[in-house]
Amino acid sequence: MWSDILGLALFVSLNPLLLGFILLVLSRPRPVPNLVVFWVGCLIVNVPGFLIPLFVLRAVPSFAEFAEDLTTADPSSGIEPFQLGTGIFALAVSAVIALRMWVKRRANQPVLVGSGAGDRGPTDDASTLVLDSGAREAREPGAIARMILRMRSALQRLVSRLHQEWENGALWVALVFGLAYIPPPPLVLLVDTIIGGSGAPIGTQIIAVFVFIMAMLAVFEITLLSYVIAPRRTQAVLEPLHEWSHRHRQMILLVLFGAVGIWELIVGLGVI
């Protein structure tokens, strides 16, 4: 059991999604405290995420077969629904990020202004006045339009507030990111099946769950331990990494979601 869960934890620790989260957190002010809070958030969500299914599997053996049917490939088509859905979602997020980067790049390009504005005649001016009058009437919002405008304004204020908190390095943002690192059901089922099928006492199985989670987050522990032992040297390594990840934050997200989406899509379609 121990060799199986440690080997699996080492493989999961190299997950590009987890590495991308680290780079994303490092792109914020106060990277080390944000890493600590992110690590705590991961523990908060992963400990019950692995323990509760383990207790359920021990209490209801028939539930293990039901959970396995939900996460395994279809015998006829070879399609794995969970992985396929995850891949489609990740690719959709990657496409949205790429579109936003393209729109921002287009908006930053200089706009050439023509020189024909001074050649307008009286007819053009009259037409402009008529069009302006009609445009003013069309711009008068109704009740539904005013409600939509208020909702959009409130949403813009919320997004602006969240962006401000992100730029200021608020620790609760890192905690939310840590809580969002939820273990995927196939991984939970695999780990709990290995641990539960070992026949070890319940106390040993609980310890095995904690060992797996700590090994899965080994990148965080190594970074934090290095900072405690040699803060200056660790900071010297973190600062250039922090600056690089801050400059390429959007690209990191794009590559991260794209790579995860393609991999999950390939697995979900049964290619591998």
From Swiss-Prot:
Transmembrane parts of this sequence: 5-25, 36-56, 79-99, 171-191, 206-226, 252-272
Keyword list, A-Z: Cell inner membrane, Cell membrane, Lipid transport, Membrane, Transmembrane, Transmembrane helix, Transport
InterPro entries named in the record: Gap/Sap
Membrane topology field: Multi-pass membrane protein
Subcellular localization(s) per the UniProt record: Cell inner membrane
Main location: membrane
A cellular component term, taken from the record's GO annotations: plasma membrane
BP GO annotations: lipid transport
Domain of life assignment: Bacteria
Disruption phenotype: Deletion mutant synthesizes GPL at a level similar to the wild-type strain, but is unable to transport it to the cell surface. GPLs are retained within the cytoplasmic compartment. Mutant is not able to slide.
Function: Required for the transport of peptidoglycolipids (GPLs) to the cell surface.
Family: Belongs to the peptidoglycolipid addressing protein (GAP) (TC 2.A.116) family.
Name by which UniProt lists this protein: Peptidoglycolipid exporter Gap
High-level lineage: Bacteria, Bacillati, Actinomycetota, Actinomycetes, Mycobacteriales
